[in-house]
Amino acid sequence: MKQENLEKIIAFRHVLHEHPEVSNHEEYTRKLIKEFILNHMKSYLVFDEKDWLYCMKPYQPEKKTIVLRADHDAIMNSLNTPFHGCGHDGHTAILLGVMLEEEKKESEYNIIYLFQPAEENGSGAAICKPLFDKYHVDKIFGLHNMPNLRKNVIYYRPETVMCASVGYRITLLGVQSHASEPEKGRNPVYALSAFAKAIEPLAKQTGFQPFTFKNYHFSSLAMITIIHMNVGSLNFGISPANGEICLTLRAAKENELSILERYVRSYFEGLKEKFEVSIKEFDRFDENYADPSLVEKTIMKLKSAGLEVEQLSEPIRASEDFGYYKRFAPSMFVFVGMGACPSLHHDSYVFDDEIIPTAVHMFQVVIR
């Protein structure tokens, strides 16, 4: 990578880092991205779609089309203020670095540079669907930085790369009574506690081996994490009527996430004689799946270009909304190791600029 371009990109990454914006609120971030492109590059068309943007050189319909995607939203830290604790400022800088390096070069492909919002809550990829309605996309690539993997090594997997997941907020409404007469009410605490105990085995599933849970068979990892639970309020005279439990359901395979969902919904449907039941869904993420044929061809290219690559032994348990794009084109998602450093979403996390040249080079190789 040209030193001049690297210096521009690092400086801009630091600007983004100082102006973090959470999912669905990244207006100023996109303004900065757009200004950087217009100020430093003349060969690209910039398509501002209000909630997202993409760039490309003039489209040539006779060519195949590749999409390179980067996210740009931030998260909240423990002080409840936005910060770039997942490195999306770095992902954006990497994509801009590829654009700088490729500006004067010809390609046999149409290359679309997609700047996606709102990855953290799972809504951003779907927001960008009009891009895939407008263009026939032949391949799409994405990446994520990864602390505590060897620095500047490209990590990959065919098939499942990251898990599918969804959040559920379940509320129960029974009947309130005096705390001295709990038998005259319907307190949801026991129903919620029984459910929490029932799913305890699913909270301990950490591996990707087949297993059976209550006559449901899973071929790989499936788990439920209780992230919040609440009943009543701090009032010693009341046996409460209201309670809620919030869950993250997660599975390596989308069809097996559906099995978890059926189990949870069936469990609470069975409580409707005693309680009013509400189930709301949040933050749905598709399985992040890498097309095996595309992976094989791409890894051969990366090795030939001198990049160090390593196959992950198993998928990452976390989710990434890049998985949505497999609906439209063969996709591949990789990780760039950052070496020993604080983990993603940790308050002390900072993106490491030293992986930018490797990541830019990797993207340049895949579009050749």
List where the protein language model places each region.
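Non-cysteine beta-strand/loop elements that form the S-adenosyl-L-methionine
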Residues: 67-69, 144, 168-171, 333-338
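Oxyanion-binding "anion nests"
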Residues: 228, 235-279
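Histidine/acidic-residue-rich, glycine-tolerant segments that coordinate divalent metal ions
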Residues: 56-57, 73-85, 89-90, 105-228, ...
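A short beta-alpha structural unit
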Residues: 225-232, 248, 277-299, 313-323, ...
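Acidic/His- and Gly-rich active-site-bordering loop/insert found
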Residues: 1-85, 89-109
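Zn-dependent metallopeptidase/amidohydrolase metal-coordination segment
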Residues: 310-367
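Divalent metal-coordination and catalytic microenvironments
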Residues: 16, 68, 88, 113, ...
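Buried hydrophobic packing segments
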Residues: 33, 94-102, 191-199, 363-367
